């Protein structure tokens, strides 16, 4: 999948310039699963390269890479073991681009029913805990680190892994035991296994002709008070 995209966005009152974004993309999606709705064998490889600005023009110039590998194995004829590893990196990002991020969401975010399930959607980092000068006054102060400031905050490097054991139950029901690990950072080299945020939990699925719907319960591996119940359509990956 190769394409060229031009986007223009209406500015908010807070922004003084129009937002114009031009992108050249090259995406590879190889899907060798035996069943896209309920896979038990096979793999998926997703590789994405998006180049913004540069010779194309626009407000911002940077490159975004994303690699996602998913594998599925049948165990004992009944169980399905599924694993995903997803890594992403943005090169050439400038702090000046952050003024558009609340509109475009081009950085990496984690949290929600398909990534870290013990975290609210997109809110592994928020403006209340990201140690970033969100108000642009040159200081990381109380206004930046107010815990009530629940606006999602992204970053330029991401590492995510998900592990699941899926099993059938009576009628159309199914169960999933899972563990999620991930983090986002301004430096990909800091995203080693010791720095990942881990959670674990279980899910109940209802298998429909259009695919499973699920209810997930997950809690943080270190602090059980950090937990979420999430709804999802299809499996997390």
Q: What are these model-derived regions, one by one?
A:
Residues 5, 119, 235-237:
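Flexible, glycine-rich linker and terminal segments associated
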Residues 179-192, 237:
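C-terminal beta-signal and adjacent terminal beta-strands/loops
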Residues 190-204:
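A short alpha/beta connector and helix-capping loop motif
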């Amino acid at each position: 999948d190769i394409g060229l995209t031009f986007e223009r966005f209406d500015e908010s009152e807070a922004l003084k310039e129009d937002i114009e974004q031009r992108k050249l993309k090259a995406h590879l999606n190889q899907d060798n699963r035996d069943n896209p709705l309920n896979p038990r064998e096979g793999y998926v490889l997703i590789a994405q390269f998006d180049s913004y600005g540069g010779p194309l023009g626009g407000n911002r110039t940077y490159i975004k890479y994303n690699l996602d590998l998913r594998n599925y194995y049948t165990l004992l004829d009944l169980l399905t073991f599924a694993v995903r590893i997803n890594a992403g990196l943005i090169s050439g990002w400038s702090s000046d681009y952050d003024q558009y991020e609340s509109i475009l969401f081009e950085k990496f975010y984690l949290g929600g029913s398909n990534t870290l399930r013990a975290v609210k959607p997109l809110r592994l980092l928020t403006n209340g805990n990201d140690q970033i000068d969100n108000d642009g006054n040159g200081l990381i102060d109380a206004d930046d680190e107010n815990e009530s400031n629940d606006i999602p905050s992204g970053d330029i490097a991401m590492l995510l892994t998900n592990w699941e054991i899926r099993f059938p139950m009576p009628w159309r029901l199914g169960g999933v035991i899972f563990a999620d690990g991930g983090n986002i950072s301004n430096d990909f080299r800091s995203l080693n296994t010791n720095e990942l945020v881990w959670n674990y939990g279980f899910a109940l699925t209802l298998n429909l002709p259009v695919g499973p719907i699920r209810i997930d319960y997950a809690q943080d591996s270190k602090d059980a008070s950090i937990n979420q119940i999430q709804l999802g359509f299809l499996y997390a990956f």
